[in-house]
C-alpha cells in the first residue's frame, strides 16, 4: 500500500488518522507523521480504511438509494461510485461501465487526485 500525505488510513486497525508528513532516506520511508494524536509511526502500522457511505458524505458526495443500489456522485465529476447489496466496497463507474472496484478511502483519494489534480477535502473532523 502506498502511503500519501494528506490521505487517511487506519492506524493499528483501531484509529483513523491523516498522514501529515513523511521522511525519506533515498527511496525508503523512514518516518510518518500523523495528526491527532500527533505521533511518528512505522509504515507497517497502517492499513486501509474501508470506504463507506459515511466517508463519501464527508468528502461531499451526494448519495441516492434506488432498488438496492447506492449511487454516489460529486458535482462536476462525470464518474459515479455505485454500491450493490452484499458488497462492502463501491464500483467506480462511467455511465454504466464499471472501471474498477474501490474498497478503501485512500483509493478514492488517489482517483480524485489523478482525475482532478487536487485533493479530496472535507470539513468534518475524523473521530
Where are these regions (language model features)?
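Amphipathic, interaction-prone secondary-structure segments
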Residues: 59-85
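Loop/turn positions that initiate beta-strands
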Residues: 4-6, 12
Amino acid at each position: 500500500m502506498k502511503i500519501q500525505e494528506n490521505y487517511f488510513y487506519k492506524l493499528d486497525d483501531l484509529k483513523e488518522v491523516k498522514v501529515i508528513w513523511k521522511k525519506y532516506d533515498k527511496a525508503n520511508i523512514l518516518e510518518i507523521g500523523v495528526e491527532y494524536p500527533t505521533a511518528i509511526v512505522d509504515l507497517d502500522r497502517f492499513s486501509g480504511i474501508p470506504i463507506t457511505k459515511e466517508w463519501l458524505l464527508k468528502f461531499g458526495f451526494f448519495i441516492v438509494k434506488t432498488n438496492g443500489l447506492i449511487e454516489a456522485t460529486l458535482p462536476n465529476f462525470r464518474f459515479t461510485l455505485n454500491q450493490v447489496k452484499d458488497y462492502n466496497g463501491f464500483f467506480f463507474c462511467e455511465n454504466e461501465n464499471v472501471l474498477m472496484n474501490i474498497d478503501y478511502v485512500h483509493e478514492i483519494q488517489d482517483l480524485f487526485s489523478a482525475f482532478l489534480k487536487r485533493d479530496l477535502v472535507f470539513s468534518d473532523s475524523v473521530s
